[in-house]
Amino acid sequence: MTLSMYHYIEQTWQNKDWRRSILRKRLIEWRRQPAITRIDRPTRLNRARALGYKAKQGFVMVRVRVRRGGLNKPRPNSGRRPKRMGVYGYGPSKGYRWIAEERAARKFPNLEVLGSYYVAEDGMYKYYEVIMVDYSHPVIRSDPELKWLQDSVNRKRVFRGLTSAGQKSRGLTKSRGLKGTVQRKWKKKQKERQLKRRHEATRYYRLQHSGRKIPGK
């Protein structure tokens, strides 16, 4: 079977030597640019075409830079234990790709988000490319595959969690449930804390009936 051009593009992106040499130079240039930058063409053509991108009028490509890490929460002035400060260990309740889509939609309010994909990351930022469509353009209105964007029910769809990134963060993807979402991680961590408290509370009882020496006795 003959492999398509997009197969070789994907192999190029998976090549570590290529990522160290060429992509590193691009990251240095991208960091100097604004956080939301309009670009002429998609960087990963195979991913863009898989999400519905077409090289025609009405399509706009935007590269968004999102800061990595947890939330930058203010440190309280009143005294308390460091673990109760509520500063560290808190991350955003949304995925970074969803945040990038919302920022692009606020930058271009006359466009609708069709999809997005991951591009690259460095020690401080993550970079995503968002596919945006001008639903009022005559070329888009006459396209049978894209004219659904002009319906009023699809306005501001990114802010209602209707994109792929939004559905993933909400745990609505098929045969996935909450697996891999932020909600599942917090539920798992909460369950671990409850088991740990229960374990520490019964430690003295377990040591007393096991015949082992109880610390401090």
Curated annotation (Swiss-Prot):
Record key words, sorted: Ribonucleoprotein, Ribosomal protein
Taxonomy of the source species: Archaea, Thermoproteota, Thermoprotei, Sulfolobales, Sulfolobaceae
SUPFAM superfamilies linked: Ribosomal proteins S24e, L23 and L15e
Gene: rpl15e
Name of the protein: Large ribosomal subunit protein eL15
PROSITE patterns from the UniProt entry: RIBOSOMAL_L15E
Record-linked PANTHER family: LARGE RIBOSOMAL SUBUNIT PROTEIN EL15, RIBOSOMAL PROTEIN L15
Region spans: Disordered: 165-202
Entries under Pfam families matching the protein: Ribosomal_L15e
InterPro entries documented for this protein: Rbsml_eL15_core_dom_sf, Ribosomal_eL15, Ribosomal_eL15_arc, Ribosomal_eL15_CS, Ribosomal_uL23/eL15/eS24_sf
Basic residues bias (residue ranges): 171-200
Any one GO BP annotation for this protein: cytoplasmic translation
Family the entry assigns: Belongs to the eukaryotic ribosomal protein eL15 family.
One of the record's GO molecular function terms: structural constituent of ribosome
Gene Ontology cellular component annotations, sorted alphabetically: cytosolic large ribosomal subunit
The keyword Ribosomal protein belongs to this UniProt entry's keyword annotation: yes
